[in-house]
């Protein structure tokens, strides 16, 4: 391996699998074969971000050199369960997915920005992160269900979009409140509060 640009940053095998499209078992096997160093925090197996970065090289929109030091630090915090960092990572991949929602060349297998966005946004939403809920609503409204592509049924996507936007509004997300009011004008005024 050459000099590592992010020498002490590591992520879980599961997050490595999500980002690269390689299975957790593949990452375990690469560790067993000595191809990737196994790091640990005492609780879970971790791999250096550089190993994940090398596995992502050549993937449009997610190329290894597209990661700034700040992006990697946010990724590490998201992997550790920080809701705001999960929402930030999810929103970055959601933007990639939404830009690619129009008919275009499909992403390489396993490197689907929509699927990665759902992974991080769902974890942040489980922690009541309103921005993550809103982003999930936007993904579903664009026809991008958890598979990350437009193959899901439109009715299901529309229902999920409405549900996530309503949840974001209930958690105080200002834009989601306005969207919900525009969709359902006969609703009583939604209370302000929560997080925006």
Positions of PLM-derived features:
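Hydrophobic face of amphipathic alpha-helices that form TPR/SEL1-like repeat modules
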Residues: 88-100, 138-143, 182-183
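Short helix-start
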Residues: 10-12, 31, 35-62
């Amino acid at each position: 391996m050459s000099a590592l640009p992010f020498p002490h940053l590591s992520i879980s095998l599961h997050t490595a699998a999500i980002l690269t499209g390689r299975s957790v078992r593949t990452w375990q096997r690469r560790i067993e074969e000595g191809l990737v160093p196994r790091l640990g925090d005492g609780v879970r197996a971790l791999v250096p971000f550089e190993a994940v970065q090398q596995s992502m090289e050549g993937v449009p929109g997610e190329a290894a050199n597209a990661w700034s030091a700040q992006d990697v630090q946010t990724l590490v915090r998201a992997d550790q369960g920080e809701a705001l960092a999960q929402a930030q990572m999810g929103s970055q991949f959601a933007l990639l997915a939404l830009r690619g929602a129009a008919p275009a060349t499909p992403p390489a297998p396993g490197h689907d920005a929509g699927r990665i966005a759902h992974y991080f946004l769902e974890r942040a939403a489980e922690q009541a992160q309103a921005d993550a809920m809103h982003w999930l609503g936007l993904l579903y409204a664009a026809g991008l269900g958890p598979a990350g592509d437009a193959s899901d049924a439109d009715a299901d996507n529309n229902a999920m979009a409405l549900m996530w936007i309503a949840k974001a509004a209930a958690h105080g997300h200002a834009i989601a409140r306005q969207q919900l009011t525009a969709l359902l004008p006969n609703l009583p005024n939604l209370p302000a509060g929560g997080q925006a």
